[in-house]
């Protein structure tokens, strides 16, 4: 049974190119079947706009599980965005709250933990 569910957000995806903690997390997930990494599609798109090719790169990593948006998710993320939450943060918040595995709880793994203050999700700070 998977014990650790972590949602990677846009800043964490962008940090893959040089942040040791993010790289170590990817490596750890490869070695540990109890850790599952999730990436919201919107976060991957947002990261690829900034760093072309990152979406293709993360799509090739076996330990990354992409999260699509269904209609209720689109509405929830859109509402958060209208409330001033950045798109990638909103997508990660929704993903952490609604993993496709029943009964699962997830943390958002991020290099920008302050973005999640007041969002009602747990955060795994990749700066430590």
Residue ranges and their predicted role:
Residues 45-47:
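Alpha-helical substrate-recognition element adjacent to the catalytic core
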Residues 61-66, 120-128:
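Active-site regions of enzymes building and remodeling cell-envelope glycoconjugates
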Residues 66-113:
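Active-site neighborhoods of divalent-metal-dependent phosphate/nucleic-acid chemistry enzymes
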């Amino acid at each position: 049974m998977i014990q650790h569910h972590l949602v990677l957000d846009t800043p964490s995806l962008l940090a893959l190119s040089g942040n040791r903690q993010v790289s170590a997390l990817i490596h750890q997930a490869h070695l540990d079947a109890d850790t599952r990494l999730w990436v919201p599609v919107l976060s991957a798109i947002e990261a690829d706009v900034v760093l072309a090719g990152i979406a293709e790169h993360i799509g090739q990593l076996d330990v990354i599980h992409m999260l699509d948006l269904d209609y209720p998710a689109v509405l929830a993320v859109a509402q958060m965005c209208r409330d001033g939450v950045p798109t990638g943060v909103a997508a990660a918040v929704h993903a952490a709250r609604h993993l496709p595995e029943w009964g699962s709880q997830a943390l958002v793994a991020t290099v920008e933990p302050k973005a999640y203050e007041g969002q009602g999700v747990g955060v795994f700070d990749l700066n430590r």
